[in-house]
Amino acid sequence: MVNIAINGFGRIGRNVLRALYESGRNNEFNVVAINDIAKPEGIAHLLKYDTAHGRFRFDVALENNTLNVAGDDIALLAISDIKELPWRDLGVDIVLECTGKFDDRASGQAHLDAGAGKVLFSSPGSPDLDNTVIFGTNEDTLTSEQKLVSNGSCTTNCIVPVIQALDAAFGVESGTITTIHASMHDQQVIDAYHEDLRRTRAASQSIIPVDTRLAAGIERILPKFAGKFEAIAVRVPTINVTAMDLSVTLQSKVTIEQVNQALRSAKAGRLQGILDYTEEPLVSVDFNHDPHSCIVDGTQTRVSHKQLVKTLVWCDNEWGFANRMLDTAKVMFDAK
C-alpha cells in the first residue's frame, strides 16, 4: 500500500482521487492527506459534484477537518508553506504535487525535507528534476534514487505515444502540432485583466491562441527529435476534452491504411490502456471520462505525397492525465 498525499485539490487533484476510487485502486493507494487552502465544505462539495465528470459515486462525508471517502479517513490540511507540512508524521511515501504553482526542484526538495519519500509533479516541471515520465514510453527509466519526478503535461502524454508508434513503424523526420484545448481555470469568464492579453477575453466567446511548451516537452522525452517539432495551441469554449492535430513527415512512403494499421496495432502491447483507436463518427464529448492518454481518430488520417501524414488524436485532458499520475506513482514506489 502506497501512502500518498495530494498537495493542491483543483481539477487534477480531485480527478486523481476520483480515479483512484473509480478504478478500484484504493487497494493500492492510501490517501493520508489533502492539502489545500480551500474551505473543507468546498473540498467535499466539489469532490461529490463535478460539471464535467458528474456525481462521484462513492460516499463522501466531512467531519471537522477529516474527509471520509468510502469509509476511508483523509486528513484535510490548509498549510501554504511546504516546509510546515506534516509529511513525516503521516508517513507519506509520495506527494502528488497538483497545485501547478510549485513545479521546480526547490519546491520538491521542500516536500522531501518535510518528510515525504518522493514527489510526483502534475506539470512539466523544471528541467533539473530527476526525471520526466510519459507512461507507456519511458517509465522503465525510473530508479529508486529519482525522488523528484514530473508526469509531463496532458498534451505530452497524448501526443508522445502516437509519435512513438509512427516512428517505430515508419520513421519520423519532423512534425508540427496544433493543440485544440478545452478552456482552463487561467481564463476569464468575462473580459478581465490578465498578463496575457489574449487571456483577458471571455473564454466562452472566442477561440483563443495561447503559448505552449509542447515541443520542448517532446524533446525532453524523445531527445532524437530535438529541433524537429513545433507546436501551437488554441483554447476553445468547451470545459473538457482536447484534440491534437499532428502532422509528420515520414521516412517511408505510406498509405492511409498503412498508417491506421500501425496505430491500431500500437494499442496492444506496451501501449495497451494508454493509446486507443477508433473509426466511429465521434465528437469531443464522447471522449469525456476516457482513461486513455490518447485516442487516435482513424477517420481523420490523411496522407499527402506519400510521406506527409496528418492524424487527429483525442484525449480527456483531465481524466486521462489523472490516471497516468496513479500509474507513474505506483512505478515510482516500486522502483528498485
UniProtKB/Swiss-Prot annotation:
**Classification via CDD domains:** GAPDH_C_E4PDH, GAPDH_N_E4PDH
Active-site residue list: 154 (nucleophile)
What gene is it encoded by? epd
The protein depicted here goes by the name: D-erythrose-4-phosphate dehydrogenase
As one GO molecular function, the record gives: NAD binding
Task: Tell me which HAMAP family the record gives.
Answer: E4P_dehydrog
Q: What does this protein do?
A: Catalyzes the NAD-dependent conversion of D-erythrose 4-phosphate to 4-phosphoerythronate.
List ligand-binding residues for substrate.
Answer: 153-155, 199, 212-213, 235
